[in-house]
Amino acid sequence: IPAAPVAAQARKLLRDLAFRPPLLAARSQVVQLTPRRWLNLQEYQSKKLMSDNGVKVQRFFVADTANEALEAAKRLNAKEIVLKAQILAGGRGKGVFSSGLKGGVHLTKDPEVVGQLAKQMIGYNLATKQTPKEGVKVNKVMVAEALDISRETYLAILMDRSCNGPVLVGSPQGGVDIEEVAASNPELIFKEQIDIIEGIKDSQAQRMAENLGFLGPLQNQAADQIKKLYNLFLKIDATQVEVNPFGETPEGQVVCFDAKINFDDNAEFRQKDIFAMDDKSENEPIENEAAKYDLKYIGLDGNIACFVNGAGLAMATCDIIFLNGGKPANFLDLGGGVKESQVYQAFKLLTADPKVEAILVNIFGGIVNCAIIANGITKACRELELKVPLVVRLEGTNVHEAQNILTNSGLPITSAVDLEDAAKKAVASVTKK
């Protein structure tokens, strides 16, 4: 199996596609909290989902005070305890708290130490390589039984469009970055395509368990866990269930030690209980505000605001701004069923950002009615007293009516004939300042 495709399937296939290479430089300086473009759950929530569906995980409790953490550690009555700060960002183990405590993951055999550490975690910000400099506030900790791992493997279930369905991806080398394994030892990556109608076959689960290196009774146990993980994957409308490590203990137990679950946002209507667990406290406030009006907002570090319909067009708009020497301040996707009120709210969000020095509207009207966009723009400009340059490029449904609305508005709106023209004018409007 070629290394690159496997690596992509293992970790990147279902990542948000909002950023192409030209945007990576800006992406590293995104002005937001923990980057999220899909529903993610905290570690303890994912483990509870797995446990409730028969998947073997370590025993744990969740605490939101130091006293609760201490009592949880006592109730576990374990030989060793692991205390984990619960935030959505990675790199917790090497993070630093605003309290001065180093590390968001700690091992101890003493319940009293758990209480002492929790005092320095809960209510304080934890900064990691994936958080803003100031870090993210920790509201909860997970107090879990620390199990010895005699062997670590990797297992993931992905919804792979190229295979028209779910795919099992596994490797006997777990506990490490799967991309590294795929690049250095591609022969250690194994893949099983699953017919979504027939479901996972016993033979597929057994073969994957064997490829992961489980032997004897452990092989049957691993195969059973794989099938339960697949059933969970379908039941909760996941797009990815990644277990790393998927390991075995010296006592002969197959355990899912850590898991990441991504969900299909389109399934929210039938997964209400799961989506109700979404922790929005780590989002940028403006992103939460945008979601109230069905707007998809991603903050970037530039000064040209982008107001676009459709993720693909938004990517192209950000790219062409870069190519013309500018930097996008955001990625704002209006979507399909547009109302004037949405346009107004979008402008309200954009103009509230002090970084924004110009706004570029780029709309291709298929389902979207350009006239509605134009009316929303003129209303927003008047009521919000727009003070930054506005460049508008419209194409598609009712575009001539829309252009007349803008032209006759008497507002200082710069029209553009195409995307290239729009980007050049937006960049030029900022450069003049």
From Swiss-Prot:
Its cofactor is Mg(2+). The keyword GTP-binding applies. Residues 1-38 form a transit peptide. Its EC number is 6.2.1.4. The keyword Mitochondrion applies. Binds 1 Mg(2+) ion per subunit. This is Succinate--CoA ligase [GDP-forming] subunit beta, mitochondrial. The lineage of its organism: Eukaryota, Metazoa, Chordata, Craniata, Vertebrata.
